[in-house]
Amino acid sequence: MEKLIEELRSRVSELEEELHRVRNGEQVHEGHRAKINTMSAEVVDSNPYSRLMALKRMGIVEDYEKIRTFTVAVVGVGGVGSVTAEMLTRCGIGKLLLFDYDKVEMANMNRLFFQPHQAGLSKVEAAEHTLRNINPDVQFEVHNYNITTLDNFQHFMDRISKGGLKEGTPVDLVLSCVDNFEARMAINTACNELVQIWMESGVSENAVSGHIQLIKPGETACFACAPPLVVAANIDEKTLKREGVCAASLPTTMGVVAGMLVQNVLKYLLNFGTVSFYLGYNAMQDFFPTMAMKPNPQCGDKYCRKQQEEFKLKEAARPKQEPIVVKEEEIVHEDNDWGIELVSEVSEEELKAASGPVPELPEGIKVAYTVPITEPTSGFIVEDSEQSLDELMAQMKNL
């Protein structure tokens, strides 16, 4: 106990000294770099952006420094959210808004971000302290509350609509990294009402699968368009939690899902590559399914239905482009003075014999190959002589 008290006193002393230096505008710790006003592509050990700026030199990103103009809100600073915030900070995002009401616990140490000495701190406070040390160029705004309560929900909507890099402007993207459906539905409602593009992410309860999803209100399916069973059945998810039972958590799956999410964010903000509307991950089979989901006209969210109607009007007002008909040019062969002809080595009868029946399929679907009908193998049938192996060997020696 005395040792613990001494450690806590030492920590308090360090924090008091750090607070004193911050108030005096001094550098808090040795080794902390000063802020960088302009990103540079100069390849030197002291440049934290040289590897990122190399993306422009290699033709991947047209203007990487544009990332400093964007604001991203991360809701949920847990296994996925904390790693997502760290990746965006290292990438040099302009501003991060962090929302979470939970505290750091020792049970969180199997994740990739928090450290044991941060136990007891709010997750947003611990995250801001670590992230600010990683990259002082990024602006941070943290909110330690539950967004699903009435008062906090209104404040949450206010911040994502006015908390951009330039105060009074909306954020560029909202990232849902929460672990419960109630919070997801709150984010979904807010973004539908504000017409705010957002990305949803999640990891399964058994920790071996996850997904990310880009949601554009009115254009793609929102979270309420195709809700999980627990939401569609109006089940209180709190009743599903049993005492002494918790969801599994693998740092590997958390890292993979966070990586997919941030990669999609970068492609969306910096306009390179193909942005995925839905990307899944199955760790058991290393399977990455992709798809795009259309909105549900009977969605339970009235703001989603409203945005669907407005999107249809925009599409109808857009000038229609005439389909470009490509005229096939006739192939003109040169004179064949030698009379050379290309003849297939396989006859039509052989091709027909090597192919099997084609099943009836819906329009637009074709089989990659068919399996030929196998015929019984013709040949001699050897009768069973009921002789032992030794007797057969003796007969062979006498031949």
UniProtKB/Swiss-Prot annotation:
Zn(2+) binds at residues 222, 225, 299, 304. Residues 344-374 are annotated as: Linker. The keyword Nucleotide-binding applies. A motif (UFM1-interacting sequence (UIS)) lies at residues 331-343. Coiled coil: none annotated. Pfam families: ThiF. GO terms for molecular function: ATP binding; protein homodimerization activity; UFM1 activating enzyme activity; zinc ion binding. The active site is at 246 (glycyl thioester intermediate). ATP binds at residues 79, 100, 123, 146, 180. A motif (UFC1-binding sequence (UFC)) lies at residues 384-399. Its main location: cytoplasm. Homodimer; homodimerization is required for ufm1 activation. Interacts (via UIS motif) with ufm1; binds ufm1 via a trans-binding mechanism in which ufm1 interacts with distinct sites in both subunits of the uba5 homodimer. Interacts (via C-terminus) with ufc1. This is Ubiquitin-like modifier-activating enzyme 5. The gene is uba5.
